[in-house]
């Protein structure tokens, strides 16, 4: 019984002595905003929410939400490529919709990027989003060993 207790105590001591993950701000091109675009802590990446409103999407009456979701996801693809990540590294998604009636339209495009083994996700309907956007999406990703 004592050897097991000793091993457990040594394991707990080693865990307590580990260095916490280093926090690093990445892709911080938002000097006018009080938040970071991406924060990395160890192998975990926390992405601020992204919206995609442009004159072309604002002019859409049908398919606007789908166009915004596709633009957001493609901007994530570019960012992930820069950081050496893939959509398969995403473990949590948070989606904010200005109109809950756009859920099916958003979901159809979102599913294209997570065809197999999708991450956990929360979807929330909100009163409004910055810039008149219909959709905002934020992710948490963990870099997988490759």
Spell out what each predicted region is:
Residues 5-74, 78-91, 97-146:
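N-terminal presequence-like segments and the immediate start of the first folded domain
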Residues 1-2:
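N-terminal secretory signal peptides that target proteins for export/translocation
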